[in-house]
Structures are given as C-alpha cells and as structure tokens.
Amino acid sequence: MDYGLWNKLFSADLLTEEMLDNGLAYNEDLLANWRAFLVAPGCAFCDFAGYHYRQHAASASHRALPPQSIDDQRRAAAEIRATAPAEMQQSVNAFYYEKLVYLASMILRRANATDYRVQLNELKIGIAAGADDPQLGRNPLLPRSIRFSAWLTLHMPRLWQWACRNFLKDRQ
C-alpha cells in the first residue's frame, strides 16, 4: 500500500516514525521527504506545474512566521547538508546557502525585523562565512540572483531591506 506525504507518494514500508516526527514545527515536511528520499531504492518524477501549498489559502506560506520558523528551517537545511551523499554535495551546498539568503530576506521584508535580530545576525554570519567558499557562495550551481542577494545582505543591508519590504510582499 502507498501513502502520500505532502503530495509525494511513498511505500508505507519506507516511512518511519522518526521521519515523520522529526521535532520540527516548520519545514518538517522538507526534512521528512529528504529522509525518505535517502533510503528510497528509487524514485519517479511526475511533472506538475504547480505547488499545492501556495495554492491552498490556509497554507503557512501565506502567513508571517514566528522566529522559531527561522530556526527550524535552518536546522532542516543543516541536516540535509550534513546527510547528503557525496554525489549530491554540490547541489545540496547550493541549496543550503540559498536557504540562508532566503531566510535573511524573509526577515528583512518584515516591519518587525528587529524581533528577529538574533536570527538575522546568525544568518549574516553564515552568509559571510560562505561568501567566498567554492562550495557555498561561489558554488557554480548557485543562481546569480542569490549571489547578488547575499552580497546586498552583507554590504548594503539598508538598501536591501528597503527592496525586500517593497518588492518581496509574501510573509510580511
């Protein structure tokens, strides 16, 4: 029998309690899917031009998230990075650095960004530490827009905060 997990279909034998109860309140689905993916003997991709969470009005992706959400998302990304097989490391490192930059932009777009100053400072430390690293900020798989956003986060934070607040309207 097959079971669905956040719009993915898995064999029931594949899923474990630990995968599903991973201690996260946010990005728990991402981490559960990653853990299942790592132990799956194979997978099939069905192209669907949509994203169910964004299409659902009650989705958390439409609400401002509490500081814990930032911590949970960083924890999920760090575990994914730490557990990636060698052949996926370059891709996962790009994902990890992009997640740091995205989370910083998520904070900067908020009117109450000062409530997240601890998280933002931690993210900036991670972004700065990886800026010249060929596996992170200089990773060839990292989109230029993310490299530019990282640079703005570090070197022009006020301008970048203004841009985030005026042009990145979700999750304010």
Predicted segments with their positions:
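Short charge-dense sequence patches
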Residues: 20-33, 70-73, 161-168
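Conserved nucleotide-sugar donor-binding catalytic segment
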Residues: 1-65
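All-alpha amphipathic helical-bundle segments outside canonical DNA-binding/catalytic cores
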Residues: 88-95
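Catalytic core of nucleotide-sugar-dependent glycosyltransferases
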Residues: 49-56, 63-88, 100-103, 110-131
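Residue-level signal for well-ordered alpha-helical scaffold segments within enzymatic catalytic domains
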Residues: 13, 17, 35, 75, ...
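Membrane-interface aromatic/basic loop that binds lipid-linked glycans or pyrophosphate carriers
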Residues: 109-172
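Catalytic-loop motifs flanking and including active-site residues across diverse enzymes
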Residues: 32, 76, 96
